[in-house]
């Protein structure tokens, strides 16, 4: 970890073009590691990483794009953890920035109703598995009431891309209802993790 809190494997000059999904992923994994290990170094590491992330985003030195934009909610796993521990306002502000810069999956619902047969962020099956937990990880931080929106999204996804085992079809992107379509393993894992946070 750098002195300023940065934790990703790139030099300072490259940060502006670095996809910060890595920040979101690393902090999510470290949160899970802490839950298993109770390693007291982790909360301080997470605090410093997220404070640095916040400062870079709020200053405009970096912005979400690519994976970071389409997986912004992943970062909120750690933001929730640190907020519960420290309760500082900048963590709620970070959540707002991530939501504002992140993709709104409601805009892609129309694309879930038929296989688009080409790769796109909004129908990427792993992104969708991750996305289901969005409301669960944002409500407390953003002061919003929980509406069970994940169920609405699930109903659309299941209706047009569902399987008998409650997963969605997709090798990279949603594949429709054909019984010959499978499901990418990463999507299974991410869907399970979303359900863990939802229920």
Predicted regions and their residues:
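Glycan-recognition and catalytic cores of secretory/periplasmic carbohydrate-active enzymes
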Residues: 1-199
């Amino acid at each position: 970890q750098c002195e300023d809190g940065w934790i990703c494997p790139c030099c300072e000059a490259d940060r502006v073009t670095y996809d910060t999904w890595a920040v979101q992923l690393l902090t999510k994994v470290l949160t899970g590691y802490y839950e298993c290990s109770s390693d007291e170094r982790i909360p301080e590491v997470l605090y410093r990483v997220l404070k640095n992330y916040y400062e870079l985003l709020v200053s405009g030195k970096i912005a979400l794009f690519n994976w970071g934009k389409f997986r912004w909610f992943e970062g909120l796993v750690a933001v929730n953890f640190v907020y519960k521990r420290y309760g500082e306002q900048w963590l709620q502000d970070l959540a707002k920035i991530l939501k504002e810069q992140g993709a709104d999956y409601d805009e892609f619902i129309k694309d879930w109703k038929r296989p688009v047969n080409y790769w796109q962020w909004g129908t990427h099956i792993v992104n969708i598995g991750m996305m289901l937990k969005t409301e669960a990880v944002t409500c407390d931080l953003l002061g919003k009431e929980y509406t069970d929106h994940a169920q609405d999204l699930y109903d659309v996804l299941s209706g047009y891309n569902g399987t008998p085992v409650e997963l969605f079809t997709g090798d990279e992107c949603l594949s429709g209802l054909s019984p010959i379509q499978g499901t990418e393993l990463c999507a299974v894992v991410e869907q399970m993790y979303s359900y863990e946070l939802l229920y």
